[in-house]
Every structure is written in structure tokens, then in C-alpha cells.
């Protein structure tokens, strides 16, 4: 049986039935009804949003890279809203470990670097 480090650490991923909206500087930078929520012991739930539901024109890739033994190597982006730049506020595991493959193609936002990560009923307006 293959070892599954993330599962062994109690990390789970599930579909979020709600609408998730990320705002920075009064602007919506992500809006989805297809978010995945990652749960890990001792940490807040983290929303992962499909790239196709993120305004990628507002993101600029940075040189920062980190490694997580459970998820893999993370790449980072800064958010640009007008003259404001929020450094390394977004990350993605572009080639995650096999048991975290569900988050491939998804982005996550640091809640303390954006104005809001809102969860609403799926049919709610912006």
C-alpha cells in the first residue's frame, strides 16, 4: 500500500457547496462556486479556487517558492489593484503530491493579505 503523507497527517479536501468571493481594494479578484476546502489539524480551513475563476490579469508571479512535505512545491503571486501591490498573497501547488492532486490548477489566498474571503449561498449575487 502506498504511503499517503497528507492523509496520514489528517489533511482532507472536499468540494465547498458555497460561493466563494475574494476581494482586494474593493475589487473582486476571485468568484467561484467550485472551490475546494482543505482542512488540516490545527489550521483554519483554506479555500482553493480554480484558476479559471480568478482574475489572473491582477496577479503577477513572484520568485517565492516553498515546499510542504504533504502537498509539494508552492508557487506564489502578488495581487495588483491600481497602485497597490499585495506581495505573495496567492499560492498554488502546480504539481502537488499524488494524494493532493485535486488542488492542481487551483489557487489559494492568504486571508490576512486580502480584504475578504467571503462564503455565501451558491446562488447569491456578488
Name these PLM-found stretches.
Residues 1-126:
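Terminal leader/tail segments of proteins
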Amino acid at each position: 500500500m502506498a504511503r499517503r503523507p497528507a492523509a496520514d497527517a489528517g489533511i482532507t479536501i472536499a468540494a465547498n457547496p458555497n460561493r466563494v468571493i475574494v476581494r482586494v481594494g474593493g475589487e473582486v479578484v476571485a468568484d467561484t462556486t467550485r472551490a475546494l476546502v482543505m482542512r488540516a489539524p490545527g489550521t483554519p480551513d483554506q479555500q482553493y479556487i480554480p484558476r479559471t475563476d480568478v482574475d489572473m490579469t491582477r496577479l503577477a508571479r513572484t520568485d517565492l517558492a516553498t515546499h510542504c512535505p504533504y502537498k509539494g512545491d508552492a508557487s506564489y503571486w502578488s495581487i495588483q489593484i491600481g497602485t497597490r501591490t499585495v506581495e505573495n498573497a496567492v499560492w498554488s501547488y502546480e504539481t502537488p503530491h499524488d494524494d493532493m492532486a485535486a488542488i492542481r490548477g487551483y489557487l489559494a489566498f492568504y486571508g490576512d493579505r486580502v480584504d475578504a474571503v467571503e462564503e455565501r449561498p451558491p446562488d447569491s449575487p456578488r
